[in-house]
């Protein structure tokens, strides 16, 4: 998925591994072969100098914050989430894993429901139902991620998760699956028993939509070209639309 390639060249005695994050694999292949010869250099016997990273680590972990007094009211309660019919019709029901493979599986994930939080000092757990699966992740609330095994769309993942109260009535959760290219971010805002869940992801859905828009001809016939551009332009707002719920 997303242009992950492993190429072995016996003639050049090299192994080339690449994860591009590009949806259109042919574009990645063209790029590889366009620059492939420049990647091969003669070995002069000298050790390869250490290369300093040019990019910093992604800010995956939420910083530690003060806990909210609302924890006592939320503890152990079940949050029932509404189903978004537009997302279901489009084939993108809201999932805790924003990666295409969970939507392409025959055992499709999506339609997160029955969310339960339990708090314990520097950690909390978040439990939810999705499809036929029931998962619980352990989230660090002290700025350090915790790991948890989860299963979605019939596939096993290890999730790195953190959580923090953004304000007295809003909790945010970050979850990144090991081996995945995306991190799911959700903010749950509470107004009495009413819950508003605002999803986002890293990489953003907008980046995926922009990449798809560049290849709109692959998805729509010429007569619908303009319609396709409009559809992809609106995709982030549809997929990341707020979802309402209620504390039972």
Give residue ranges: language-model regions.
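Structural signature of eukaryotic scaffold interfaces centered on beta-propeller domains
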Residues: 163-165
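Residue-level recognition of beta-strand termini and adjacent short loop/turns
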Residues: 167-169
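Catalytic loop of the DD-peptidase/beta-lactamase superfamily, centered on the K-T-G motif
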Residues: 1-137, 144-156, 177-241, 246-248
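A conserved acidic, glycine/proline-rich C-terminal tail/linker
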Residues: 173-175
């Amino acid at each position: 998925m997303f242009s992950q390639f492993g190429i072995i060249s016996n003639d050049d005695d090299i192994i080339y591994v690449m994860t591009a994050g590009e949806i259109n694999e042919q574009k990645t292949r063209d790029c590889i072969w366009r620059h492939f010869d420049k990647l091969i250099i003669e070995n002069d016997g000298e050790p390869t100098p250490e290369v300093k990273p040019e990019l910093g680590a992604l800010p995956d972990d939420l910083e530690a914050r003060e806990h909210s007094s609302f924890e006592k009211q939320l503890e152990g309660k079940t949050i029932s989430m509404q189903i978004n019919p537009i997302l279901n019709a489009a084939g993108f029901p809201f999932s805790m894993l924003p990666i295409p493979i969970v939507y392409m599986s025959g055992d499709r994930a999506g339609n997160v429901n029955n969310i339960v939080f339990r708090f314990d000092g520097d950690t909390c757990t978040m439990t939810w139902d999705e499809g036929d699966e029931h998962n619980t992740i352990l989230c660090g609330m002290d700025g350090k991620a915790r790991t948890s095994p989860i299963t979605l769309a019939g596939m096993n993942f290890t999730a790195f998760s953190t959580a923090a109260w953004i304000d007295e009535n809003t909790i945010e959760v970050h979850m990144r699956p090991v081996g995945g290219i995306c991190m799911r971010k959700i903010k749950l805002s509470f107004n009495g028993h009413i819950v508003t869940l605002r999803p986002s992801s890293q990489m953003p859905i907008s980046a995926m939509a922009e990449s798809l828009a560049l290849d709109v001809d692959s998805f729509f016939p010429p007569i619908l070209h303009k319609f396709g551009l409009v559809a992809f332009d609106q995709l982030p707002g549809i997929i990341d639309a707020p979802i309402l719920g209620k504390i039972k």
